[in-house]
């Protein structure tokens, strides 16, 4: 169910030149126009409330969030491995096991800063007066990788096991907030890590910059290292490949969290726009995937021909009884429509009787209507909404299947409209088509507004039921109203109106195409 209005044909405005809507007569412009071909839309092109969202697929917004969370988990493990592989050099600095070799380069240049760096891990942190400690930067990035790993694992697990919590708007709001916080923190941790593992980046412009460059210059100039290379000093001055990979993965994690936020917002919008009965969280197998048994089918056909179906006139009488419902569900009088516009051809008895069913009748049970248009239900329905915060599918009795027109296809409708509205041959005929278009458009809009009011009310009640506590008075009242509107929406009157709207749309599209063809012929 959609809260947005049904799709409407564009208004007829001959004073505006819009090639994708209407091509006005060439006489209005006094010049030559180049108009794109205008194609008529099919009668049943798109109705939002008939759209089904398959959220169980990996290509849907929730499925993309699952994929991104899985990628974040893998990248967090890779960041942890890359950063942890370089911790050994920092541990050696802190213990001062190479104190003899370290004191020579540092003692000569920085003897007055920190006592000659007896312990290198602490010397540059305190003796330099505020440089970023590589161990602190690496610890910060490791901590953020751990937090991101835990958060992404929770998101992935709750989505894969299809828990009730992961099917609510509140869940995706939490995902948005957590992803935003973690993305910002990972960005800060990555910047700090870059400063920690690259001493020349933080030394530029400081009072100790020249000393840092002097120490590390031997590793930046080719052939200047000599025979002896201090491995610990080398890893301090040069960014290791593992550290570079960790930096790249840090920015990739930020991008992944940004995409998670985008798809979480899209999921919330779709959940606000569509009813829960239009969202499939689990893949449902309606038909059994079994090879056809021709022998059994012949037996069923021969055995089933003994029973006579109800007369076709009874079927037509049940369908052709339109009544106008208001938004509150009360009957406000009858409204007659032309029988030729929405009347369905009678159901062929042989076809209806000879088709074998592989499922039980209860799986396709629909509300029944008597000849006097009163709704008959097998039993009194209880509220079909679940607990607040849980996304529970509506009772299958309430599912609405699209109202069909029997054997009348779009091509047959087009032939009918072509007989009623043949190609235009004169300007007077064009003006007549314009008046018919305007009158039909007004009726189309008013009827769609009446149907859309029921859809909006259902969507509002659907959101309210998620906020109420089950078994409360507000919940029961809202559930009763929700079920009543679902019955109204499943009634034959609502479906006949909906079918009439679709055929009106086909009529308006045909008129628009005829006018467009006439205008193109005149150019």
UniProtKB/Swiss-Prot annotation:
Residue span(s) of domain OCEL: 415-523
Residue ranges of the region described as Disordered: 1-20, 302-338, 363-408
Location in the cell: Cell membrane; Cell junction, Tight junction
Principal cellular location given in the protein's record: membrane
Regions of this protein lying in the Cytoplasmic compartment: 1-66, 162-173, 266-523
Record PTM Phosphoserine, positions in chain: 302, 313, 321, 340, 360, 370-371, 409, 491
Key words of the record: Cell junction, Cell membrane, Coiled coil, Disulfide bond, Membrane, Phosphoprotein, Tight junction, Transmembrane, Transmembrane helix
Stretches in topological domain Extracellular: 88-140, 195-244
A single BP term in Gene Ontology: regulation of D-glucose transmembrane transport
Any Pfam family: MARVEL
Polar residues biased stretches: 368-381
Function: May play a role in the formation and regulation of the tight junction (TJ) paracellular permeability barrier. May be involved in the organization of actin in endothelial cells.
Protein name: Occludin
Gene encoding the protein: Ocln
């Amino acid at each position: 169910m959609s809260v947005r209005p049904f799709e409407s044909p564009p208004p007829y405005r001959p004073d505006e030149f819009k090639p994708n809507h209407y091509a006005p007569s060439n006489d209005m412009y006094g010049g030559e126009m180049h108009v794109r071909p205008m194609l008529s839309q099919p009668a049943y092109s798109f109705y939002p409330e008939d759209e089904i969202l398959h959220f169980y697929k990996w290509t849907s917004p929730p499925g993309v969030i699952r994929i991104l969370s899985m990628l974040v988990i893998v990248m967090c493990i890779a960041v942890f491995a890359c950063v942890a592989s370089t911790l050994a050099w920092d541990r050696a600095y802190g213990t001062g096991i190479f104190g003899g070799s370290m004191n020579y380069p540092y003692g000569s240049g920085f003897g007055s800063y920190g006592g000659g760096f007896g312990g290198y891990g602490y010397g540059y942190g305190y003796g330099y007066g505020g440089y970023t400690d590589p161990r602190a930067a690496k610890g910060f990035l490791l901590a953020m990788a751990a937090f991101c790993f835990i958060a992404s694992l929770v998101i992935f697990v709750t989505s894969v096991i299809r828990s009730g919590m992961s099917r609510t708007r509140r869940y995706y709001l939490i995902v948005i907030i957590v992803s935003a916080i973690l993305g910002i923190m990972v960005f800060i941790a990555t910047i700090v890590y870059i400063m920690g593992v690259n001493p020349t980046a933080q030394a530029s412009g400081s009072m100790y910059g020249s000393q840092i460059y002097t120490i590390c210059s031997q590793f930046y100039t080719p052939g200047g290292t000599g025979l002896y290379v201090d491995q610990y000093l080398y890893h301090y001055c040069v960014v290791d490949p593992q550290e570079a990979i960790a930096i790249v993965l840090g920015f990739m994690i930020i991008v992944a969290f940004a995409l998670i936020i985008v798809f979480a917002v899209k999921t919330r919008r779709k959940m606000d726009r569509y009813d829960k009965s239009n969202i499939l969280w689990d893949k449902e197998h309606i038909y059994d995937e079994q090879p056809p048994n021709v022998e059994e089918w012949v037996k069923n056909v021969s055995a089933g021909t003994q029973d006579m179906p109800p007369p076709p006139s009874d079927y037509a009488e049940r369908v052709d009884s339109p009544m106008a419902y208001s938004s509150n569900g009360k009957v406000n009088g009858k409204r007659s429509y032309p029988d030729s516009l929405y009347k369905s051809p009678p159901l062929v008895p042989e076809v209806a009787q000879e088709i074998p069913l592989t499922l039980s009748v209860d799986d396709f049970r629909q509300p029944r209507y008597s000849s006097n248009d009163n709704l008959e239900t097998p039993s009194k329905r209880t509220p079909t909404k679940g607990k607040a915060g849980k996304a529970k599918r509506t009772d299958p009795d309430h599912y609405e299947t699209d109202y069909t027109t029997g054997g009348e296809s779009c091509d047959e409708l087009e032939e009918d409209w072509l007989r009623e509205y043949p190609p235009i041959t004169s300007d007077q005929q064009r003006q007549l088509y314009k008046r018919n278009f305007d009158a039909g458009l007004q009726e189309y809009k008013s009827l769609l507004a009446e149907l859309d009011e029921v859809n909006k009310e259902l969507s509002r009640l659907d959101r309210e039921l998620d906020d109420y506590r089950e078994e409360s008075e507000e919940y029961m009242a809202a559930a009763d109203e929700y079920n009543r509107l679902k019955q109204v929406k499943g009634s034959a009157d609502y479906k006949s109106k909906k079918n009439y709207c679709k055929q009106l749309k086909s009529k308006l599209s045909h008129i628009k195409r005829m006018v467009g063809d006439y205008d193109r012929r005149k150019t």
